[in-house]
């Protein structure tokens, strides 16, 4: 379906198993290539929707000096936004527990920024999904952290895991965005290249 991409060697610049799964779901052939030590920092003046977009584009910038003319680099970043606060990946189990307590019984936003970069051009976009959690008990939170170890997930949860089944009361927007890659929007943007 995406014949226009045949001229590119597609590089997914992410170790996220969820992003790999989602990109594979589009039927796109790609390689994974990551660079160590890319800082995920941003200016304090950015709005919520700008933060993951800024970080995704900064990740892409790290590849500019090593890109080949036939490469298309896909970079992404996801944050959880609640009450004016960014929730990234937890630092430890206590941090994960605090995040899940804060999300319990509330609606938050999951925002993913995606950057598509070639030697000659760059296209970027972000997607926002609202997620409403039911009230979670301490036992449910502790069980989830102990069994699923969500240390690699923004907001300390994976919607596709147990906590999503028992705790997510509703979503508005892309389910796949909550997993880490808004694949429908990505497909649309890739068709434009």
Curated annotation (Swiss-Prot):
It holds the Pfam family Maf. Its main location: cytoplasm. Its cofactor is a divalent metal cation. GO terms for molecular function: dTTP diphosphatase activity; UTP diphosphatase activity. It is found in: Cytoplasm. InterPro entries: ITPase-like_fam (IPR029001), Maf-like (IPR003697). GO terms for cellular component: cytoplasm. The active site is at residue 77. It catalyses: dTTP + H2O = dTMP + diphosphate + H(+); UTP + H2O = UMP + diphosphate + H(+). Belongs to the Maf family. YhdE subfamily. Nucleoside triphosphate pyrophosphatase that hydrolyzes dTTP and UTP. May have a dual role in cell division arrest and in preventing the incorporation of modified nucleotides into cellular nucleic acids. This is dTTP/UTP pyrophosphatase. It comes from Phocaeicola vulgatus (strain ATCC 8482 / DSM 1447 / JCM 5826 / CCUG 4940 / NBRC 14291 / NCTC 11154) (Bacteroides vulgatus).
């Amino acid at each position: 379906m995406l014949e226009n991409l045949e001229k590119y060697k597609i590089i997914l610049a992410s170790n996220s198993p969820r992003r790999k799964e989602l990109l594979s779901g589009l039927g796109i052939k790609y390689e994974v290539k990551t660079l160590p030590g890319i800082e995920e920092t941003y200016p304090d003046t950015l709005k919520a929707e700008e933060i993951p977009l800024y970080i995704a584009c900064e990740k892409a910038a790290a590849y500019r000096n090593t890109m080949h003319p036939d490469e298309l680099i896909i970079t992404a970043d996801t944050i959880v936004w609640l009450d004016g606060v960014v929730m990234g990946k937890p630092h430890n189990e206590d941090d994960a527990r605090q995040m899940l307590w804060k999300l319990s019984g509330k609606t938050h936003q999951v925002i993913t920024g995606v950057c598509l970069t070639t030697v000659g051009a760059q296209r970027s976009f972000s997607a926002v999904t609202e997620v409403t959690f039911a009230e979670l008990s301490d036992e449910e939170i502790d069980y989830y952290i102990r069994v699923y170890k969500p240390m690699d997930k923004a907001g300390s949860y994976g919607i596709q895991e147990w906590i999503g089944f028992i705790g997510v009361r509703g979503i508005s927007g892309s389910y796949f965005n909550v997993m880490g890659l808004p694949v429908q929007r990505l497909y649309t943007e890739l068709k434009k290249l």
